Amino acid sequence: MKNYSGILSYTQSISYQLGIGENLDAFILKSNSRIMFWKNKMGLRKWFEKNRNFIWINNPQAKFDIEALNSYNNIFLNNISIFITGCNSSLIPFLKKNKFEIMKTGKEAILNLDYAHFRNKSLKEIIRIGFKHGNIIEVPYSDKIRDKLEEFKSECTHSNEPQLKYLYNDILLPSNRLFVFESENGAWLGAITVRIMDKEKVITDLILRSKMATKGTMEALIYSIFGKIKQEGFISWSLGEVPYIIYDSPKLTKEFLINFTGRRLKFAYNYLGLYNFKNKFEPEWQEVYTCGKPKLNLTTFVKAASFSNMTTLVRSKFFYNLYSSGKAFRNNEIKRKPVNSDYSKVS
């Protein structure tokens, strides 16, 4: 029995040799999603779901035949637990029919390319300021450009923090389109990668902003991409999901607890800043679901958080904030201490 662990993308350009056969590969490609296989090992993670094996499918954008996956149960030792994140509403009837448990865990920002998303005067001014500092270009894929984008990530906001993994396509693929905000001296100040979902829809993968970016950089970039793909005949553009912005869940349900807990972790993952940025373009917010079979256990979310590096990010930011608070307190105490505390010597 091989130890299956890794990730297979929706495109063949990234290949992890899992040895799982062509049929399952076809299922993965058909579902246009990312799929991860993680077989439990003895040790710290044993308690999560006992010996139940765990498959995580992220961001499926098309209906797929669940039987194509179930037929490969013999790959694993015993039972199988399927965890699907990033489901849009079109998948929900199919998943309900296949006895998945379903909960709302976020919303996706959709731009209608026939709608005036940039009519706000303050947004127009920000875009105008952005265009003063450079130009937007589309950069064709090459190995050199892929490597340059990886280097650019180290220059971006939050690059010194633990990075999330597997929640989106985090490297440039041949099937991606790359748009860059380039300064007058040729430096990259912002980058967005998108992929063509079908003849109507475009989906955002990466949104990267340099630490050196000026005001309006990302707004100008989005404005330019919007115009470009509209001219090409597309109908909608997804700016991606914002998690934890579900506020109408019945209290003390699993859906409520997941969203409530996620919002408490804003110090580590600033979902609200992400929401405010995307919301300035007046998108249509469509609900995004997380689905599980046979059911959604809270421990499965913990497992996914660990695998995606979220727990590492939370731990890092928690101790950094704790250290910063302690340092600020000590500095404040030093400032408050009088230079000469022996008042009897003051005439």
Task: Set out the residue ranges of the language-model regions.
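Short acidic, S/G/P-rich loop/turn micro-motifs used as interaction or catalytic elements
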Residues: 61-64
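A conserved beta-strand-loop-helix scaffold within acyl/acetyltransferase catalytic domains
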Residues: 2-58, 83-254, 268-276, 286, ...
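A short acidic, glycine-rich active-site loop
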Residues: 260-269
